[in-house]
């Protein structure tokens, strides 16, 4: 009995050590706040950041994760933004009919317009007692002088839509519902992107039947339920980790799928199979919104793994049971020269119409 109590206390202590945000660590470098010298000086004050990883996204959403020693980044800083510091084998990722085996070189061009995140390995401590960190810098993939990755497609798509909208509004032809829009005062077209991330968590060694999950869903057993045990602890830590990286989490809650977890003789939550959701603040930079989503998935996976839980972001991981929807909220607005912002998707009469003509 005493041994069991000690084991339980030890587990609790370890969990407490895991979930504390370390104020001595650097979790992200905000875009636009530091120049070259500022970034280099900041990194030198955090020697536990030992690696740099350029994060490129292929056409299937896979992200690269290599380990470049931090000394090379500090020495060749400008080369990382010129696309001459790091290359990868494009034939090994999903770039269909673009980077082939005999023409596979893809250059990685670092992106300074978005936040850079630091990913820490808590299983590997540096000499100062802090976990070893990797600076993750989002990048574009360049092949034969052309950008070919998902991030560049998103950037070019937004630029294309903005240009077409400017041309439409400045054409002189009346746009229904936009007659009062001060076209001559428009300085820029901007986008707002907000995502909602749903996911399933489960105990890896346990398997629940579709029938059990389906019955629970029909009976609405998980609707408005509280999170308990290691699921609650992992969710709370994930929120703290995301907030520490400047994502401004708005909500974490249970979704409709799942079953009630069991409790063992020591009070530990076991046999977990639940559906959850995490939401954070939208971004005025579509690339930043996409990067936030990717980084959030990585952090959530790592945090829940520490508590013995497996995470799936698949749209339909279990046939016949509620899937994980990916709600993406898109807004388009006109930024005026006087600093005012006008929502281009809102109709002139909110009671008569749902959306504007645009």
PLM segments and residue spans:
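ATP/Mg2+-dependent ligation/transfer catalytic cores
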Residues: 3-254, 258, 283-298
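Short, internal active-site loops enriched in acidic
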Residues: 59, 204-206, 261-265, 317-321
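Loop-rich catalytic cores of soluble enzymes, especially ATP-dependent carboxylate-amine ligases
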Residues: 83, 213, 220-221, 228, ...
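Long, charged, glycine-rich C-terminal linkers/tails
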Residues: 252-261, 312-318
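A short mid-domain helix/strand-loop element embedded in enzyme catalytic domains
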Residues: 256, 263-275
């Amino acid at each position: 009995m005493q041994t069991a109590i000690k084991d339980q206390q030890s587990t609790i202590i370890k969990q407490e050590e895991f979930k504390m945000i370390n104020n001595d660590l650097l979790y992200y470098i905000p875009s636009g706040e530091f120049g070259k010298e500022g970034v280099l000086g900041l990194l030198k004050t955090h020697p536990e950041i030992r690696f740099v990883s350029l994060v490129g996204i292929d056409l299937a959403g896979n992200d690269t994760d290599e380990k470049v020693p931090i000394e090379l980044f500090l020495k060749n800083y400008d080369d990382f933004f010129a696309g001459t510091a790091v290359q990868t084998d494009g034939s090994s990722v999903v770039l269909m009919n673009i980077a082939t085996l005999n023409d596979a070189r893809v250059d990685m061009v670092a992106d300074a317009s978005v936040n850079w995140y630091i990913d820490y390995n808590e299983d590997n401590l540096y000499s100062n007692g802090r976990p070893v960190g990797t600076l993750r810098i989002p990048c574009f993939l360049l092949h034969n002088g052309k950008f070919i990755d998902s991030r560049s497609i998103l950037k070019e798509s937004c630029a294309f839509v903005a240009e077409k909208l400017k041309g439409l509004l400045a054409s002189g032809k009346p746009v229904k519902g936009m007659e009062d829009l001060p076209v001559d005062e428009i300085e820029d077209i901007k986008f707002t992107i907000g995502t909602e991330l749903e996911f399933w968590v489960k105990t890896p060694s346990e398997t629940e039947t579709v029938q059990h999950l389906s019955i629970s869903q029909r009976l609405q057993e998980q609707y408005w339920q509280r999170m308990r045990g290691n699921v609650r602890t992992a969710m709370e830590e994930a929120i703290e980790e995301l907030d520490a990286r400047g994502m401004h989490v708005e909500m974490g809650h249970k979704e409709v799928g799942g079953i009630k977890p069991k409790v063992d003789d020591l009070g530990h939550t076991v046999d977990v199979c639940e559906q959850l959701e995490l939401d954070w603040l939208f971004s005025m930079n579509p690339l930043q919104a996409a990067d936030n989503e990717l980084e959030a998935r990585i952090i959530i996976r790592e945090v829940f793994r520490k508590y013995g839980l497996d995470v799936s972001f698949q749209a339909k991981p279990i046939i016949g049971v509620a899937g994980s929807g990916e709600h993406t909220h898109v807004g388009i607005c006109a930024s005026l020269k006087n600093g005012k912002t006008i929502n281009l998707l809102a109709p002139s009469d909110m009671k008569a119409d749902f959306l504007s003509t645009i």
